[in-house]
């Protein structure tokens, strides 16, 4: 994969100009990470906003390849980079698999994650959901299961969160997030770019290089290369 990392990093270097050059902070645990909803109303950002590298992920909570990325692929390495302050992670949460395989689990999971964001627990809950992902064809993200999993995140369960899960309080967010996912595909992919898709500093990782998402060492090398290129551009300007 090494040569592919070099090729991909070169593309990202061209888009590096204009990124922030402040020194980002480090965090001891996921619980400490800043998280916020963007002005577009759909993008959730986790990590120090001053981080030189931004990784924007497009995911569907029922997607087994997303689970592979998050659990055994490069997801843990991205999490470590976010904790170190060298990268921040953004999420656009799709729910198209409900229509494709039936059920409402994706929508319910996205709604529950939005409720967790209100409690400052998005990143922690996101980890728990993927660690306990049901089979794709099983509509397993029920209200009861989502609440049970929320019990694994200290301080998340409470009347407001529980009610938001049971009533689909953030249905509008779920719909808007799916539309944002579809728009990200552009004219070539009007139904969305596929999940998982990673966009690094505004440049999508090409589909032919998606193997990087399952190779933690290669993904870390990519992030470091992009970070160096971004810092170099910042020093020039």
Q: Which role does the model predict for each range below?
A:
Residues 146-148:
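Flexible, glycine-rich surface segments
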Residues 21-25, 152-237:
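C-terminal cap of thioredoxin/glutaredoxin-like
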Residues 1-101, 225-237:
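Extracytoplasmic thiol/disulfide redox context detector
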Residues 67-144:
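Structural alpha/beta surface segment adjacent to cysteine/selenocysteine redox centers
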Residues 68-71, 82-83, 114-121, 127-135, ...:
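Sec-exported extracytoplasmic/periplasmic mature domains
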Residues 58-60, 92-95, 127-130, 166, ...:
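Active-site-proximal beta-strand/loop segments in catalytic clefts of secreted hydrolases
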Residues 52, 109, 192-195:
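A structure-centric signal for secondary-structure junctions around beta-strands
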């Amino acid at each position: 994969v090494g040569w592919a990392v070099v090729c991909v990093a070169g593309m990202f270097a061209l888009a590096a100009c204009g990124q922030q050059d402040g020194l980002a902070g480090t965090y001891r645990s996921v619980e400490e990470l800043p998280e916020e909803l963007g002005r577009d109303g759909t993008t959730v950002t986790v990590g120090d906003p001053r981080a030189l590298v931004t990784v924007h992920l497009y995911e569907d909570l029922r997607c087994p390849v997303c689970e592979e990325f998050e659990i055994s692929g490069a997801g843990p390495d991205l999490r470590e980079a976010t904790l170190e302050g060298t990268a921040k992670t953004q999420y656009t949460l799709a729910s198209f698999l409900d229509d494709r395989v039936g059920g409402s689990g994706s929508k319910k999971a996205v709604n529950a994650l939005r409720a967790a964001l209100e409690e400052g627990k998005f990143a922690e809950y996101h980890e728990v959901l993927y660690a306990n992902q049901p089979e794709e064809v099983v509509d397993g993200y029920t209200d009861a299961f989502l609440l049970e999993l929320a019990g694994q995140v200290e301080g998340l369960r409470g009347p407001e969160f529980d009610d938001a899960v049971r009533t689909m309080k953030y249905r509008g967010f779920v719909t808007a997030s799916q539309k944002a996912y579809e728009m990200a595909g552009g004219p070539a992919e009007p139904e969305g770019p596929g999940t998982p898709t990673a966009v690094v500093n505004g440049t999508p990782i090409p589909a032919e290089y998606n193997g990087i998402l399952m190779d933690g060492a290669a993904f870390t090398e990519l992030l470091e290369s992009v970070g160096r290129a971004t810092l170099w551009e910042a020093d020039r300007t």
